[in-house]
Amino acid sequence: PRTFSSAASDVYKRQLLINVGTPDEPTVKSVRDYLREFLLDPDVIDAPYIIRQLLVRGIILRVRPKKVAPLYQKIWMEDGSPLRVYSDRITKSLNSMVEDVEFEFAMRYGNPSIKFGLESLKQKGVEELLLLPMFPHYAQATTESALKHAYKQLKLINWQPKIIEMGHFETDEEYVIPLTKSIQSQIDKDTHLLFSYHGLPVSHVKRIDKSKNHCQQLDNCCAIKSEANQLCYGHHCMLTTQTVVGLLGLKEEQWSLSFQSRIGPVKWLEPSTTNKVEELVNRGIKKLAIVAPAFLADGLETLEELDIGIREHFLELGGEELTVIKCLNDNQDWVEGLSKLVDKKFSQSATA
C-alpha cells in the first residue's frame, strides 16, 4: 500500500474523527433506538420541541421501526451494518496508508459514539484533532449536527485540543475524480445517468440564504452561484453534478438530478427520485444508471431504496436496464483521495 506522510508532523500529533450513523442491529428495537436519537435532533427536524416530540414519539416511532427493520435485514452484512463495515474498512485502510495520523471513526447517531471516539483519542494524548463529517455537501442536518455534537462532547469530557474542521468538499478533486471513475466504467453512450442525492426539507436550505432573495426565489436557484448559497446543500449537489458531468463529457440530455429518502409531510427539494424515474421512462429512457454522490458508503438508502425499491419501480414502468452504481465505500482511489484531503487540511492549518 502507498504511504502518505502528512505535513508538519513535528508540530502536532494529528488524529481524525469520522462521523456517520446506523442502527446496531436490524431489529425493531435497535431501529427504534436509532430513529429516536436521529429524529429528535433539532437539526434534523427543526420543529418546536413539543411538536417534534409528538411527531417522533407519537407517530413515527410507533410505525416506522416495524417497516424499516425488515429493510435493514435485506442489506445486513455478515460483519454488521454496511455503513459501519465500510467505515471500519476505510479507517483501517487510512491507518495503514498514512504514517503520522491515527484515524478513528464514530457515529453521530448510534455506535461507536462520538464521545467514545473522542475519549479514545484523548487517552492517546492527541494535540491536534481534525473533525471530518463524512458528508461532501454541507447541511445543517448532517455536517452542522455532527460538528455541534462533537464540540458538546469535547466540553463534557473536558478536553481542549486544537480543532480543525472539514466542512464540505463537493468539488475537491480528491473526491470528484474517484467518484467520476466509479461511474465511468458503469455507463455507455446509451445510458442516462441520474444523480440521486439525499433529500432535504426546503426550510433547511432557505435558512442558509440570509438575503432571502435567492433560495426558492430564482428559477434554478441551486445552479446559480451566489454569496447567498455558498453553504446551500442544493447548490453543493449541483456543483458536484456539474463537475462530474464535465469530467465525463456528458451532454445535457444524458443526465438528470433528483433527491431521495423523504420523511414527513413537509416540502422537500425537488424533483424526487421516484418522480424523476417516472419522467425519464415516459421520455423513452430504457437504460438508466443511478449514482448517489451524497453517500460515501452504501447503506439502506442505496442498497434497499435504490437497488431494490427504485429498481422494481423502474422495471414496472417499462424500463429495461438499471445499474445502481456502488458508493465509493473503501475503493482504493477514494481512500487515497481522502488521505490527501486530510493532508491538505492539516497543511492549510499549519500555514494559517
Task: Show the residue positions of the predicted features.
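C-terminal accessory extensions appended to soluble enzyme cores
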Residues: 278, 291, 308, 325-352
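A solvent-exposed, charged loop/short amphipathic helix patch at secondary-structure junctions
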Residues: 37-41, 208-229
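Single conserved hydrophobic/aromatic residue that forms the stacking wall/gate
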Residues: 1-8, 12
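A structural motif corresponding to the C-terminal end of an alpha-helix
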Residues: 90-102, 157, 240-254, 317-319
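Short, flexible loop segments at boundaries between secondary-structure elements
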Residues: 159-173, 220-242, 257-260, 309-337
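A short, acidic, amphipathic alpha-helical segment used as a generic capping/interface helix at domain edges
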Residues: 118-119, 264-285, 309-311
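Long, hydrophobic, well-ordered secondary-structure blocks that form the structural core
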Residues: 104-179
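N-terminal glycine-rich anion-binding loop in soluble enzyme alpha/beta folds
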Residues: 13-105
